[in-house]
């Protein structure tokens, strides 16, 4: 089964109550929030009404909230290869005795 992955890109501040009610019916309340909707004509019509505010893609399966957050996160720019915990323990033992 396919799903629409809908992400709210722009805020509904200052827009008509009709647009805000459509966003509410799609369960989009905050910017950059993501919802998954079934692919059907009703949801397609709702998305079409707010097409200027959202980004839409079709996916095969829903992602969990944690997976969604990880996919949006940027890389840190470095990787930790080794931690120097054993050396610190030895230093602490030397100063304690």
From Swiss-Prot:
Query: Which Gene3D superfamilies does UniProt cross-reference here?
Result: Ribosomal protein L30, ferredoxin-like fold domain
Query: Where does this polypeptide localize?
Result: Mitochondrion
Q: Which GO terms describe its cellular component?
A: mitochondrial large ribosomal subunit; mitochondrion
What are the GO MF terms of this UniProt record?
structural constituent of ribosome
Its predominant location is: mitochondrion
Q: Name one Pfam family in it.
A: Ribosomal_L30
InterPro entries in alphabetical order:
Ribo_uL30_ferredoxin-like_sf, Ribosomal_uL30_bac-type, Ribosomal_uL30_ferredoxin-like
DNA repair in keyword set: no
- The protein here is known as Large ribosomal subunit protein uL30m
Which keywords describe this protein according to UniProt?
Answer: Mitochondrion, Ribonucleoprotein, Ribosomal protein
Quaternary structure annotation from Swiss-Prot or TrEMBL: Component of the mitochondrial large ribosomal subunit (mt-LSU). Mature yeast 74S mitochondrial ribosomes consist of a small (37S) and a large (54S) subunit. The 37S small subunit contains a 15S ribosomal RNA (15S mt-rRNA) and at least 32 different proteins. The 54S large subunit contains a 21S rRNA (21S mt-rRNA) and at least 45 different proteins.
What stretch or stretches form a coiled coil here? none
Superkingdom, according to UniProt? Eukaryota
What is the role of the protein in this entry?
Component of the mitochondrial ribosome (mitoribosome), a dedicated translation machinery responsible for the synthesis of mitochondrial genome-encoded proteins, including at least some of the essential transmembrane subunits of the mitochondrial respiratory chain. The mitoribosomes are attached to the mitochondrial inner membrane and translation products are cotranslationally integrated into the membrane.
PANTHER family reported for this sequence: LARGE RIBOSOMAL SUBUNIT PROTEIN UL30M, MITOCHONDRIAL RIBOSOMAL PROTEIN L30
Q: Which GO terms describe its biological process?
A: mitochondrial translation
The answer to whether the entry has keyword tRNA-binding is no
The record's similarity note reads: Belongs to the universal ribosomal protein uL30 family.
